[in-house]
Amino acid sequence: MIIKKLIPKSLKKIYHFTFAKLAAFVYGYPSRELTVVGITGTGGKSSVVYLLARLLESAGWLVGATSTVFFKIGDWEKLNNKKMTMLGRFQTQKMLRQMVRAGCKVAIIETTSQGIEQYRHLDIDYNTVVLTNLYPEHIEAHGGFANYKKAKGKLFATRPKTIIVNGDDANAEYFLNFSAKNKIKFCITDLQDLKLDWQGIHFFWNNTRFDLPLLGKFNAYNALCALTIAKSLGLSVEEIKKAAPVMQNIPGRLEFIDNGQQFKIIVDYAYEPKAMVGLYETIKMIPHQKVIHVLGATGGGRDRARRPILGQIVGEQANYAIITDEDPYDEDPREIINQVAEGALKVGKKECENFWKILDRREAIAKAISLAQKDDLILITGKGAEQAICVANEKKIPWDDRRVVRELLKNMSEEKSKYPVGSFVDLFTSEKGVRRARAHCVLQADGSVACTGDADILAALERGVSVLIDGEPHYYQPQDGIKFLLAVSAHFSNPYLFASEIQKL
């Protein structure tokens, strides 16, 4: 890394090329002993890698895979904790050699445009290369869409045996013009009688019915892509049908987190505008009340232009938006948050009313949970199953949105257990440190809270005034005071009680 930083920009390509050649030589060109499938595109790459790996494995193949989501070598696998989609040259070649030693038949490699530009694909003997789709993204890194498309094209120029392309994509013909023995197009019309609903995607493919627990049209494309690749590798439709039930539960992709709470929580990787729009199209099929969305944007100079666009999309679609830190790298995370917030403000969101800026991502998620009521839907986007937050000086902070959500839900459940039916607290509103109104609240058997005392406190609570909670145990909750108290009844049907419902004790 130190050597790389010292190399002049004009010599960087030579550096990357030389080390790519050296890495393949050191590890003995392992890809020559594998059937290598390279998956590239703007969206869906990781999902296709995951679905294909599961499908082939279920069909009895030993599989290796590398992607944003996970690494897999035969029976061994783990989530990707490197914060890199395509590993460096030596790491990639080493992993390919390990796949050979493990007896893997196929290696599936998520291959990025930036990885291609740095020659990480060099001397990998791709048997099959696949394009999921292509649309404007990572433009700042490549200096324009034309350069971005050209970078993707370099993978197809490796003269693979088979090229597989999304035929519905506007750029399909560009990639189909590259040389290959077999050229295959897949189109959404290949899925006959396609139906999308809350339970998944349902269709006929090659006169065979499939019912997959994957949500959304984009996952119909991802599944179709994986099925098409599997068939091109030699699996029969009957073998694919038998193996297909494993095509589900992609980590950090529309992943539901369920701890028994009465509202839904989805963690998703969507980090750019098109994916965000697709996510909102998909959740229309999910029964829900209000939408509470936690999001951020990536730093490090990555596509700054999309930041206010993300804020605008969420500002228009969500009832509540909470903008937080994501991966700031060397940028000021507050400035990134402000740029995203511009979009939300533009479409009428009002700070501290239906939109918040919270720097700490854990606090932002906790805020979303505190806002959620029965049948609401919380979206947490931008990181998916990523295992770290990237900050300044190339440091990585261990992180997993899903783990944090589970911890917060567990804490909420533990707080609930501290308040048996009949327990009470005294509430005091606090504005600028001055105690004002007071109420006495008792938890009822049905999960509601009965309050008596100064009714002004209830109006104050609705305004979001801080609350001092006295009783057993003692707590101070600086935000959403009554929410903290009512976490005990969050699983019941009537957790909220305001002025019109005051009961005399």
Residues of each region from the PLM?
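ATP-dependent carboxylate-amine ligase
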Residues: 2, 6-13, 225-238, 242-252, ...
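Short, charged beta-turn/beta-strand-edge "cap" motif at the junction between a beta-strand
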Residues: 472-477
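Short nucleic-acid-contacting surface segments enriched for D/E, G, S/T with interspersed K/R
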Residues: 456-468
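Beta-strand/loop nucleic-acid-binding surfaces
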Residues: 447-458
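Phosphate-binding loop of NTP-binding sites
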Residues: 2-167, 172-180, 224, 230-233, ...
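OB-fold/S1-family single-stranded nucleic acid-binding modules
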Residues: 478-504
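Acidic, Mg2+-coordinating active-site environments of NTP-dependent enzymes
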Residues: 32-34, 102, 126-265, 288, ...
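Structural detector for short beta-strands of small beta-barrel domains
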Residues: 418-439
